[in-house]
A protein has these predicted regions:
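Alpha/beta-hydrolase active-site loop
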Residues: 77-98, 116-117
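The feature captures the conserved acid-bearing segment of alpha/beta-hydrolase catalytic domains
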Residues: 28, 143-193
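Conserved hydrolase catalytic core segment
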Residues: 118-130
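A short loop-to-beta-strand scaffold at the N-terminal edge of the catalytic core in hydrolase folds
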Residues: 19-28, 36-37
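Gly/Ala-rich beta-loop-alpha elbow adjacent to hydrolase catalytic centers
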Residues: 106-115
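C-terminal catalytic histidine-bearing segment of alpha/beta-hydrolase fold enzymes
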Residues: 195-222
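Short, surface-exposed "cap/lid" segments of acyl-processing enzymes
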Residues: 30-63, 69-70
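Active-site nucleophile loop of the alpha/beta-hydrolase fold
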Residues: 132-144
């Protein structure tokens, strides 16, 4: 019996050690009324004001948020396949841990750029749980690695994002951009029945007013 207990303890320890760790931020909800988990991938500024304020609005509406700090995560080069696998792990872990059945995926800037490729590579059972993708200020191209120079200017390198959106079929998408953000992907997605496009004042950072973005997401989710 003693050896059986030791064996179980050892197995649990190995499983815990093998559990991947990610730069995550948890924003629990005080109201457990929603069946939806939010996974939010930030931009290159890390977990910044826009991510915090939108997450607080979503959590106050009953949807707990787990945020992936893209600055830290993409400091190391990733592949779309590996990033998708990590997203699947996060979704599975938090759906079970927070007792939710569906997921809302939100990305800002680089977070929005990587989401289509990550979602298109998810297992079918995980894709079936996705209520909607929210792309905030998505660009035309994306690299799955952060470079310090990206803080200075937009890079024209990387894989095109639009073909990855095409792979998502009828998946519901909400695309938000500033009217002065001329590099935004949103304009390339007009006319698609599964894509809702919202254009707001400002440019890539929407000129602040981040709480309003959270409310727009909630309105379109209904």
């Amino acid at each position: 019996m003693k050896y059986a207990i030791l064996l179980l303890f050892f197995a649990a320890s190995v499983a815990f050690a093998a559990t991947p760790t990610f730069p995550l931020v948890e924003v629990p909800s005080a109201h457990g009324t929603s069946d939806t988990l939010v996974v939010f991938i930030s931009g290159d500024g890390g977990w910044a004001a826009i991510d915090r304020e939108i997450s607080n609005v979503l959590a106050s509406d009953g949807m707990p948020v787990v945020g992936l700090n893209a600055l830290q995560y993409f400091w190391k080069k990733r592949t779309p396949e590996a990033a998708s696998g990590d997203l699947a792990t996060i979704i599975d872990r938090y759906l079970g841990g927070w007792h939710k059945s569906r997921v809302l995926l939100v990305g800002y800037s680089r977070g929005a750029d990587v989401l289509p490729a990550m979602v298109s590579r998810l297992p079918a059972d995980a894709q079936a749980k996705v209520r909607m993708l929210v792309l905030l200020s998505p660009s035309q191209k994306v690299e799955f690695e952060f470079h310090v120079a990206d803080w200075m200017h937009n890079s024209s390198a990387g894989m095109p994002v639009k073909p990855e959106v095409d792979k998502l079929g009828s998946q519901r998408i909400l695309c938000l951009s500033g009217q002065d953000d001329h590099d935004s992907l949103c304009g390339e997605l007009t006319g698609r029945p599964n894509v809702e496009i919202v254009t707001l004042k400002g440019a890539h950072h929407f000129d602040g007013g981040y709480g309003k973005l959270g409310q727009i997401i909630i309105e379109h989710l209904k």
